[in-house]
């Protein structure tokens, strides 16, 4: 800085055309600088990206990140990604797939139409993904009227069971589906609820009164080969990890071996940084085959990819005051990029607590995946503004980001449609998980067929 006659951060910020607050955010480890601001810093100091990343006064953690960024510089620049936001795990899919815990699903095909019952089906994101993977839905349980109408509209042949899952579990799920069909998969995402811990280890009857209990009772009744449960990533740490441990204990009591992993939708062709914890259970009598989660894809879909030629649709609008504020934010930016006095006024108390990370006044960049969509597109703490137009994403744009096909229609008011889409599992993520389950079931089928043939030949010889 001294070589450029810049003697303070104030002067550097002035030369860059930003506030000192914005510069502090760029230099801080707490925030993620957007590419345009890093480029401004390079321009003012008249040095390249590599030189900035190799400054001597970086700590060990920053140096480690330097090496990651330097080796992936072309990738980052092509995607217009934020540097700090992309961890080594995200930047090197080949490295994270070297272990044998994951399978390549690119050539997986179902040997037959595997059967599935889905609970908490919502608007069908997971069910549609599983259908694309090769599953046939035998029954879908959902409480919300509009979500049920959406399912019936798009798949008139699906057995949509609208009702209270507590009562359905009490009555027995087999009273609502074809009882002559063996179920291969039970899927669904029950809410994350805390349990009351009377003892050190809880069993099935100890979690009575929760929606998880209803899921577990139906699992116990159907005894499918596999179950799939998805939830928010916070389940892993919820109540100090006790909640997830209790669920695993209950699943084990019912007769299942359990694996779980946090999967990032962006790693499976979804233009969104949504993360979900995926719990897979395989029946203990089928433990001779090991289930593996799907490998990450070798590409990252961007918002530009997702919204190419998107059809027009309805959408929410910002109030005039909010619109004036967001007009000042560049693509990929957020409240950090606002003039200091505007940010202070707009954010209120949140300004002094760091502004809810980067969610407030956030405008998405075309050339990176979108942040996780919520049920309310204009909510202040989790704003997701269109890159070019100062407005929330429309309902069809929402659906595209969640990887729903354009022909999948939604029923209800605009707010109901946003809610259905925001709550959904991204279709492509559902398909990827589905294909990994198909691979497992294919191997089970192969073993059964081999054993049957061996027995038949032996009997024939005798």
Locate each region found by the language model.
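Residues in the helix-turn-helix
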Residues: 11, 22, 51
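Core alpha/beta nucleotide-donor-binding catalytic domains of modification enzymes
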Residues: 75, 79-223, 233-237, 242-244
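Short amphipathic recognition helices of helix-turn-helix/homeodomain-type DNA-binding modules
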Residues: 51-66
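S-adenosyl-L-methionine-dependent DNA methyltransferase catalytic core
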Residues: 62-138, 250-253, 276-416, 420, ...
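Recognition helix of helix-turn-helix/homeodomain-like DNA-binding domains
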Residues: 17-33, 55-57
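Short basic helix-loop element that most often maps to the first helix and adjoining turn
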Residues: 1-15
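DNA major-groove recognition helix of helix-turn-helix/homeodomain DNA-binding modules
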Residues: 36-51
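Conserved Class I SAM-dependent methyltransferase catalytic core
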Residues: 208-273, 277-282
